[in-house]
Swiss-Prot record:
GO terms for biological process: glutamate biosynthetic process; glutamine catabolic process. It is an enzyme of class 3 (hydrolase). Substrate binds at residues 76, 125, 169, 176, 200, 252, 270. Belongs to the glutaminase family. The gene is glsA. It catalyses: L-glutamine + H2O = L-glutamate + NH4(+). InterPro entries: Beta-lactam/transpept-like, Glutaminase. Its EC number is 3.5.1.2. Homotetramer. GO terms for molecular function: glutaminase activity. This is Glutaminase. It comes from Clavibacter michiganensis subsp. michiganensis (strain NCPPB 382).
Length: 325
């Protein structure tokens, strides 16, 4: 799908105007492997053959192919947006509460920064639980309403929570509860552990599609202004900080390899989605449920690299190199 009239649109404003996304998607059809996440039943039941891609450009045009309208829970792809909302609602003080350094640990490691008791960065579970707790609201209900409204502003449309997913995330998220209690014991988390996990679980359960997620990425890529609505969602500084941490930490302990190969700030998720934000260029989302050992979509990573190569999106120029042993 391409917005009407985009073929004649100025390529400087619409870098994807001549890109054949159907061809790009088909080129990755044989890039299989990986396993669908089974941490909750709703993810385990996902059709592994689903695949979609969507782009949103600074002038608000949407390009999409494949299963770009398929709805799924946003899962960890919500983390850069939670960080942005926390930064906005605390006037930047969230940077004192959570680190911004990469970690070689697993995304759900029961570990905090030595000496500070802070989560290492907002892209791991501990960091996202903490940033969700920093979003404005004196009660859990107020906080979760603010999170949903904020995510909807990033998307440019009203979003909904999959209540079944939210319930499963809370009931089966023992490690997240452990992280929250650890942060409480360190004096880092200032709401109850149960409320912190509940806010994060509901954020992960928000329903999106590749097209919606691409619009959210585009809002960060456009300096905090939603290109579909024209509304400012967060400041340029907040958008910059969120995208910066996506670049260094968004694919967990594979972030260095990702930036070498793809060169675009991104956040992976166990739903099989990857959201990308290429500053000043576009927002994108790729979706394919089977994951590698680090929880990143196998086919999605291939699509992201080919997209970056074709549009020259690599932050450091050129195209991504082959993976080396």
């Amino acid at each position: 799908m391409t917005a009407p009239g985009s073929a004649s649109h100025d390529a400087a404003h619409d870098p994807a105007h001549a890109l054949d996304l159907d061809r790009l998607l088909a080129s990755a059809a044989d890039d299989g492997g990986g396993q669908v996440d089974d941490s909750i039943p709703q993810l385990a039941e996902t059709d592994p053959s689903l695949a979609g891609i969507a782009l949103v450009t600074p002038d608000g045009r949407t390009h999409a192919a494949g299963d770009s309208a398929h709805a799924f829970s946003i899962q960890s792809a919500v983390k850069p947006f939670l960080f942005a909302l926390a930064l906005a609602d605390t006037d930047g003080a969230a940077l004192d509460a959570v680190g911004i350094e990469p970690t070689g640990e697993a995304f759900d490691a029961i570990k905090l920064e030595s000496g500070t008791g802070r989560p290492p960065n907002p892209m791991v579970n501990a960091g996202a639980i903490l940033t969700a707790s920093l979003v404005r609201g004196s009660t859990l209900e107020e906080r979760t309403a603010r999170i949903l409204a904020g995510l909807s502003a990033f998307a440019g449309r009203d979003l909904e929570v999959d209540e079944d997913v939210a319930e499963c995330e809370q009931l089966l998220g023992d490690r997240n509860h452990a992280l929250a209690h650890l942060m409480r014991s360190e004096g880092t988390l200032h709401v109850s552990a149960d409320d912190a996990v509940a806010a994060y679980a509901r954020a992960c359960a928000v329903l999106v599609t590749p097209e919606i997620l691409a619009a959210m990425g585009a809002t960060l890529a456009c300096g905090g202004r939603n290109p579909l609505t024209g509304s400012r969602v967060v400041s340029r500084e907040v958008a910059r900080d969120s995208v910066s941490v996506m670049a260094t930490c968004g694919v967990y302990d594979g972030s260095g390899r990702w930036m070498r190969r793809v060169g675009v700030p991104a956040k992976s998720s166990v739903s099989g989605a990857i959201v990308l934000a290429s500053p000043g260029r576009l927002g994108a989302a790729v979706f394919s449920p089977p994951l590698d050992d680090q929880g990143t979509s196998v086919r999605g990573a291939v699509l992201a690299q080919r997209l970056a190569d074709e549009l020259g999106l690599h932050a450091f120029g050129g195209t991504g190199g082959r993976e080396r042993a």
